[in-house]
Amino acid sequence: MILLIDGRSGSGKTTFSAKLHSILGWPVIHLEDVYPGWSGLQKASAAVAETILNPALPADERGYRRWDWYASEFAEWVPTPPDSSLIVEGCGAVTEANLAAARAIGDGNAWGVWVELDTQTRYARAMARDDHFEEHWDMWAEQESQHMAKHNPQQLVDWTINVPEQLTWKL
C-alpha cells in the first residue's frame, strides 16, 4: 500500500506521516528532501511519478537525488524503499500521474490524503519550524496555489483530514 499525503505548508503533513510511521512502521519519503530549492515544488511533484514511483523503472532504480538545503545543490541518490508499503508526503505529492504510478507499483493499493488547515495556523507552524521560511512564504504559497489549480489534489484524494497541534491516537 502506498499513501500520498498532500497539503499546504504547515498543515500537518509531516506530523501525520510521522504518526503513521510510528504506528505502521512504513518508510516515509518527504518531498522536502526532493524539492530543488525554494522554487522547486513542481519539479519535486513530477519526480514522484518520474523517478520515485515510476513503474517502468526496475525497483532498484527508483529513487531521487536528495536536495542539500545548506549547499543549495543536489546530494546523494536515495533509493525508494523496496517495501510494499510506503508513505510519500509533501506539497505536490498528489497528482493524477503520481496516484497512477503509486497504484501501478502498489498493486492497485494507493490512497491520497489531503491535509487541510486554516492559513493563520499553518503560517504560525511554518514560522516556528523554520527561521528562513518567512522570506519565502509568499513565493511558496504561490507554487502551492499553482499546484492546486493545475492538479486539483483536494478532489483526487480519498480522504481529507485536519491535523491538530497535538495528534493522539489510541488504536
Q: Positions of the model-derived regions?
A:
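Hydrophobic anchor at the beta1->P-loop junction of P-loop NTPases
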Residues: 5
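P-loop (Walker A) phosphate-binding loop of NTP-binding proteins
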Residues: 8
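Conserved lysine of the Walker
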Residues: 13
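Hydrophobic positions on the alpha1 helix immediately C-terminal to the Walker A/P-loop
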Residues: 16
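Post-Walker A helix-loop "phosphate-sensing" segment adjacent to the P-loop in P-loop NTPases
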Residues: 21-29
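Conserved nucleotide-sensing/catalytic segment adjacent to the nucleotide-binding pocket
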Residues: 27, 33-88
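ATP-dependent NMP and nucleoside kinases share a basic, alpha-helical "lid"
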Residues: 52, 76-129
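Small-molecule kinase domains that catalyze NTP-dependent phosphoryl transfer to phosphate-bearing small molecules
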Residues: 101, 131-171
